[in-house]
């Protein structure tokens, strides 16, 4: 996924109210931009980090700029816009990069499903295969090379796991897809120390037949591309 128009850079002052971020532009202007991330963003929002932001063509937006990437003092790149994860996975499937998810003739997004009234991120269909339900999660929490999900307690994520378990138990293909969007992450685990209920459910999901697929992205100010398969460590 290429950024067009190109991203602009600034220095992070602070993130607050979950969706807002104050930045300082190279000319000294202070600007408030939108932050599309409801997580804790641990290690991603340190004051002084370089912020890379996009500009919307929608003139009606109160905050036309969106925080896309963080560049940390030690050189790590992080995609902080969680809305990009689904787009990246769709792009990678269509490009043939995700070998585990090839051979389907139809791809749809945001399809209603499940007993808890959820929407599946990606639905793959083909007349010769079971339907494939894919829930996408963005991983940005880093601790000594280890990536963790979630970075905060997530009742919504727990609901998604219950839905995936139900899909698997009904004999259809069920996939939890971790998009690793932090250049410093070397492997991924469920964050037992942050959300023990999510950890318990992910173990149940694996036992029920839910597949866990992990791909890491290459990131820079020009583009993001999911291109490196990684293992999930329970």
Curated annotation (Swiss-Prot):
This is Sugar fermentation stimulation protein homolog. It comes from Photobacterium profundum (strain SS9). It holds the Pfam family SfsA_N. It comes from the Bacteria. One of its GO terms (molecular function) is DNA binding. InterPro entries: SfsA, SfsA_C, SfsA_N. Belongs to the SfsA family.
């Amino acid at each position: 996924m290429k950024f067009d128009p190109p991203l602009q850079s600034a220095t992070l002052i602070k993130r607050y109210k979950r969706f807002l971020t104050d930045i300082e532009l190279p000319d000294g202007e202070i600007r408030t931009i939108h932050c599309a991330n409801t997580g804790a963003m641990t290690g991603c929002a340190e004051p002084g980090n370089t912020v890379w932001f996009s500009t919307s063509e929608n003139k009606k937006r109160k905050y036309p700029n969106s925080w896309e990437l963080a560049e940390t003092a030690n050189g790590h790149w992080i995609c902080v816009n969680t809305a990009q994860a689904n787009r990246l996975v769709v792009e990678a499937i269509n490009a043939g990069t995700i070998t585990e998810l090839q051979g389907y003739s139809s791809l749809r997004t945001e399809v209603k499903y499940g007993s808890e009234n959820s929407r599946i991120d990606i639905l793959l269909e083909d007349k010769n295969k079971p339907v494939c339900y894919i829930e996408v999660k963005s991983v940005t929490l880093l601790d000594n090379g280890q990536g963790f999900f979630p970075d905060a307690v997530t009742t919504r994520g727990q609901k998604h796991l219950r839905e995936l378990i139900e899909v698997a138990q009904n004999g259809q293909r069920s996939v939890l897809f971790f998009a690793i969007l932090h250049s410093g992450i070397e492997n991924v685990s469920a964050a037992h120390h942050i959300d023990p209920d999510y950890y318990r459910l992910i173990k149940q999901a694996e036992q029920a037949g839910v597949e866990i697929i992990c791909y890491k992205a290459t990131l820079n100010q020009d583009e993001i591309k999911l291109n490196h398969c990684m293992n999930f460590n329970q």
